[in-house]
A protein has these predicted regions:
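General marker for long, soluble alpha-helical cores
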Residues: 1-190
Length: 190
C-alpha cells in the first residue's frame, strides 16, 4: 500500500492492466487522483467490480471522460450511488450505450437534471422502461428535445404521470413522435 501511495506521476502511466488487476481494493483506494488521471485505458478496463467499489467519489470524478468510457459495464454497475451523483458532465456525456444499460435504476435515479441532459441521444435510446421510470421527475425537465425523441416507445411506457407532467410543463411533450404519443396510456396522462 505504501508503494501505491508513493507512485510518481511518471510511474503510474506505466502500470499494466495485469498490475492494476492484481491490486487489492485497499491499494486501489489509495491511488492518488493525479495517478488515476494518467492510467492507460487498458488499466482502467482492468478494474474489477470490487476495485471499482473501492474508488472514492473524488477518485471517480478525477477520471477523464476518455478513461470513464473504458470502465467496464460491471465496474460501472458497481459504483455506489454517491459516485454517480458526483460524475462530471463530461463523464456523463462519455457514457456508452453498453454502460448506460448496465446502470442500476438506483444509479439512474441519482442522476441530476444537469447530468441527465448530458447523456447522448444514443445513451437515452438505450434506456429501458425501468430505467426511464427511475429518473427523478424533476430531472426530466432537463431533457433536451433530441433526448425526448430518442426514448424508445417501449421505454416511454415506464414514464410516470409526474414525469409526463414535467414534459408538458417544459413543452418537451411537443418533441414526442406520433408513435411515442400513441404509446402513452391514460394513467400516464393524469
Amino acid at each position: 500500500t505504501d508503494q501505491i501511495v508513493a507512485l510518481s506521476s511518471t510511474q503510474a502511466p506505466k502500470l499494466s492492466a495485469q498490475q492494476i488487476a492484481a491490486l487489492s481494493t485497499t491499494q486501489v483506494s489509495k491511488l492518488g487522483v493525479d495517478n488515476l488521471k494518467v492510467l492507460s485505458y487498458d488499466a482502467i478496463e482492468a478494474l474489477s467490480v470490487s476495485q471499482a467499489k473501492a474508488l472514492s467519489s473524488t477518485q471517480v470524478s478525477a477520471l477523464t471522460s476518455a478513461q470513464f468510457k473504458h470502465l467496464g459495464t460491471s465496474a460501472i454497475a458497481a459504483l455506489a450511488s454517491d459516485r454517480i451523483v458526483n460524475l462530471t458532465n463530461d463523464q456523463v456525456a462519455a457514457i456508452t450505450t453498453d454502460q448506460v444499460q448496465a446502470l442500476t435504476t438506483s444509479q439512474i435515479g441519482n442522476l441530476s437534471g444537469a447530468q441527465l441532459e448530458k447523456l447522448t441521444t444514443s445513451a437515452v435510446a438505450a434506456l429501458s422502461a425501468s430505467q426511464i421510470k427511475a429518473i427523478d421527475s424533476a430531472a426530466v425537465a432537463n431533457m433536451t428535445t433530441d433526448q425526448v425523441k430518442a426514448i424508445k416507445v417501449e421505454a416511454l411506457g415506464g414514464m410516470s404521470s409526474a414525469q409526463i407532467s414535467q414534459l408538458v410543463a417544459t413543452t418537451q411533450i411537443k418533441a414526442l413522435t406520433t408513435a411515442q404519443v400513441n404509446a402513452l396510456d391514460s394513467a400516464q396522462l393524469k
